[in-house]
């Protein structure tokens, strides 16, 4: 019996907003079960292994400020709000740029600072220039220096090895340029059989990488691993080792549930409003959060439907956890 292979990968839809790109890809026909294998693998690699540039270190030069729990004269936002906004800045760099990358903001007098006001070196681009950073009045005079570094996924500040000089505020590394990945399977006909798979993959990315480029990188990462495995077979045969190919045992990776439940809710990268509401109600970990139902969360003061939707989206994005009632 012939093994059914897909004809090609198609991009059936794509769009963009000021904040993100979107694309929908289709791969078919596939042998039954292969859409699950391919879709799940691509999703995991996309969400964990695509590198990008992010602001990770900040220094308030004028006026001098040394910690996030402070304010700046003439600036509406306090320092912690400014830092949260800087973590949302999306940066793209060319391959020839050396890291860390030094960035600066300087502004005197009344006005609004946006991400597009950040001074960047050649080869670096701010891809969401309309992002709000701070609001200044006529008394304001501010200068901020920043370092941007390259990384993957989410790296807490405490785990980052590179540390700048004294006076710098170290941020969590929010590197992942992939906002969300969904995949689903539909049946497709091949000849008289209608139970072959069609994989539909949807990818949302920040503006510093397009979905097709992110998918290309993910496929290369996967191919590199399988190429290494394939090349290893030759070494085994040369050593006189018989490779059993007829009785393969597949061991699926199991997520350590306790590890996820014990993670702090800070790792969800929620808005300050939602985060503060949860912490005031003694919700500190993912486990604490999952013990509450939707109705119970909505009873928390100042925690509304918008905050609940944000929590559900972040749980799915960061850990693949579906929280609350599923849509019919």
Curated annotation (Swiss-Prot):
Keyword list, A-Z: DNA-directed RNA polymerase, Nucleotidyltransferase, Transcription, Transferase
GO biological process, one term: DNA-templated transcription
Catalytic activities: RNA(n) + a ribonucleoside 5'-triphosphate = RNA(n+1) + diphosphate
Gene Ontology CC entries for this record: cytoplasm; DNA-directed RNA polymerase complex
GO MF annotations in UniProt: DNA binding; DNA-directed RNA polymerase activity; protein dimerization activity
Record-linked InterPro entries: DNA-dir_RNA_pol_insert (IPR011262), DNA-dir_RNA_pol_RpoA/D/Rpb3 (IPR011263), DNA-dir_RpoA (IPR011773), RBP11-like (IPR036603), RNAP_asu_C (IPR011260), RNApol_insert_sf (IPR036643)
UniProt xrefs under Pfam families: RNA_pol_A_bac, RNA_pol_A_CTD, RNA_pol_L
Region described as Alpha C-terminal domain (alpha-CTD): spans on this chain: 257-328
Superkingdom of the organism of origin: Bacteria
Chain residue ranges for the region called Alpha N-terminal domain (alpha-NTD): 1-230
Entry EC number(s): 2.7.7.6
Family: Belongs to the RNA polymerase alpha chain family.
Complex formation: Homodimer. The RNAP catalytic core consists of 2 alpha, 1 beta, 1 beta' and 1 omega subunit. When a sigma factor is associated with the core the holoenzyme is formed, which can initiate transcription.
NCBIfam families: PRK05182.1-2, PRK05182.2-5, rpoA
Biological role stated in the UniProt entry: DNA-dependent RNA polymerase catalyzes the transcription of DNA into RNA using the four ribonucleoside triphosphates as substrates.
Domain remark in the UniProt entry: The N-terminal domain is essential for RNAP assembly and basal transcription, whereas the C-terminal domain is involved in interaction with transcriptional regulators and with upstream promoter elements.
Name of this protein: DNA-directed RNA polymerase subunit alpha
């Amino acid at each position: 019996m012939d093994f059914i292979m897909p004809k090609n990968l198609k991009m059936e839809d794509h769009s963009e907003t000021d904040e993100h790109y979107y694309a929908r890809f289709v791969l078919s026909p596939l042998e039954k079960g292969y859409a699950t294998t391919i879709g799940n693998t691509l999703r995991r690699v996309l969400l964990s292994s695509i590198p990008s540039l992010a602001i990770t270190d900040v220094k308030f030069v004028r006026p001098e400020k040394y910690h996030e729990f402070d304010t700046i004269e003439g600036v509406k936002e306090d320092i912690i709000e400014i830092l949260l906004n800087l973590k949302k800045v999306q940066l793209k760099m060319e391959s020839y740029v050396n890291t860390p990358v030094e960035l600066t903001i300087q502004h005197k007098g009344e006005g609004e600072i946006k991400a597009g006001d950040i001074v960047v070196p050649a080869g670096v681009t701010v891809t969401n220039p309309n992002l709000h950073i701070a609001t200044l009045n006529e008394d304001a005079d501010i200068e901020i220096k920043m370092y941007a570094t390259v990384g993957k996924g989410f790296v807490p500040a405490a785990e980052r090895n590179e540390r700048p000089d004294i006076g710098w505020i170290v941020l969590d590394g929010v590197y992942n340029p992939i906002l969300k990945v969904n995949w689903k399977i539909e049946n497709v006909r091949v000849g008289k059989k209608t139970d072959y798979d069609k994989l539909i993959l949807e990818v949302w990315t920040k503006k510093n990488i397009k979905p097709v480029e992110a998918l290309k990188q993910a496929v290369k990462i996967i191919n590199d691993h399988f190429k290494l495995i394939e090349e290893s077979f030759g070494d085994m045969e040369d050593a006189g080792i018989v490779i059993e190919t007829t009785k393969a045992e597949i061991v699926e990776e199991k997520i350590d549930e306790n590890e996820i439940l014990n993670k702090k809710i800070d790792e969800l990268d929620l808005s300050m409003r939602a985060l503060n509401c949860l912490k005031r109600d003694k919700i500190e970990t993912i486990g604490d959060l999952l013990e509450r139902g939707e109705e119970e969360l909505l009873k928390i003061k100042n925690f509304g439907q918008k905050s609940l939707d944000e929590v559900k989206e972040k749980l799915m994005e960061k850990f693949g956890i579906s929280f609350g009632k599923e849509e019919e």
